[in-house]
């Protein structure tokens, strides 16, 4: 996935960053980084809570397991990031992904289409 989307992101003149929390020694440094994020994407998990520190209108792409419990209103806790993004005015996309455990099969074409629609060209 990363190899497939990097050229698209860089062609639109955006910086492509794979987040590593160890690079930010202070909360202030982390918040400064997050305030400049245009797109956050990854598998469903607690790191998405950081979207609260991002600009309004950030694009959120969440990879959701195909498991029925993740798509049931009886298990609505899994909808928390959709709800948070909606309340913050962010653009939310859920990409249902197969696989098991920590390995997910993400549809690269779907992610590329979302990025094409979400990233504006900042070409000079």
Describe every region a protein language model picked out.
Residues 1-124:
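N-terminal targeting/anchoring "stem" of glycan-biosynthesis enzymes
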